[in-house]
Amino acid sequence: MRLKGTIQTLLLSGVIVAVGASCSSQVPNTLTDAEKAEGWELLFDGQTLNGWRDFNGTALTEPWTVVDGCIQAKGAGSDGTGYIVTDKQYENFELSWDWKLTKGGNSGMLYHVVEGRQYQVPYVTGPEYQLIDEPNFPDKLEDWQKLGVDYAMHLPDQAKMKVNPYGQWNNSKIVFDNGHVEHWLNGQKVLEFEAWTDDWFERKNSGKWENAPEYGLATKGLFCLQDHGDPASFRNIKVKKLPRKTREVTLFNGKDLSNWVAYGTELWYVEDGLLICESGPDKGYGYLATREYYDDYDLSVEFKQEADGNSGVFIRSTVGRGVRVNGWQVEVAPPNHDTGGIYESYGRNWLIQIPDEKENILKYGDWNTLRIRVQGDNVKTYLNGEQMVDFTDEKIGKGIGRIALQIHDGGGIKVYWRNLKLTTL
């Protein structure tokens, strides 16, 4: 699914299970008592498409139906259409499903898919377990396009690949456990890797996803099936949630900007162990964002303002074209301008400002400690040990993305940062 060039170049992506043979008359979509006790849940009840809808939609209009206890694609979709997603998001999980391909069929299963107007197709955010009938596929396949791959990223162990031919059922499984990923095929583990490592980012940024900046970064998202132009059948789709693990993260190493991504032409550099942001000649907006997404966390940063000092810390944010940020800013501003308040850029503007009597907590020109606790739909901010706001918002609760530091436009800004650390919750 090479993102360079036209959408025709993406036709080999096999983005979802294009399974075409007619389904068995058996209705196997049930859970054993043991599976129920272990926490498994069905994503398909064997009779309806309840729990599924169009990608970026509110209802189900794409070419899907239920036939003989199976979800079946009608074969009317394409690379850019025909996607359906689960209503619910999943973070850490074990996902198992049965699939069956027609001759030459090409498809896959996606996870951690993110919706939004900026995402026209699911595969620019969600990784894919590739499903394809290799022996009968009409075009030459590269290794990264073959059955069982983490599409265009990681290859399976071919010695462990035991697949039933087209027209027969196979079983696949994806395990995503706090960044540890496994692909299984018919009871054999064929692939495993760690997400968000240096190696992972090197593969992402130098390969097929170099023009998809948000690919694979989401820590939670939707499961997705696609009608890729061939009839497709699925059954026994079930998932078990796995627990989130707490970890301590040092965001800034005091030496360089490793693990950060700069946006815009403003200046970001390291000097004497400090991270410094400074207005550049363009006097525009600038952002320095973590390369990873962070969902729920307790973040602590220290900052010292020089000159104007108008900056901020964005939570669950992405930065798009034209250095346009999507997300929420915890304000870092000059005196009497609501440091610690929460502002939504390009949206609702101020969501909550700090009480006037707390404006004197900021030590302008000296070091300050800003703490931000983000959990679900709630954000709490603290400045120098004093709580500034406690805010709950449904939209924030649905957000995902990076942590980002801001330089405001207008020029004349210089802010020093140090001790940027967080604990995931």
Residue ranges and their predicted role:
Residues 1-11:
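Bacterial N-terminal signal peptides that target proteins for export
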Residues 2-3, 18, 22:
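Short intrinsically disordered, low-complexity coil segments enriched in acidic
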Residues 10-20:
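Bacterial N-terminal signal peptides
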Residues 23-425:
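Carbohydrate-interacting regions of secretory-pathway proteins
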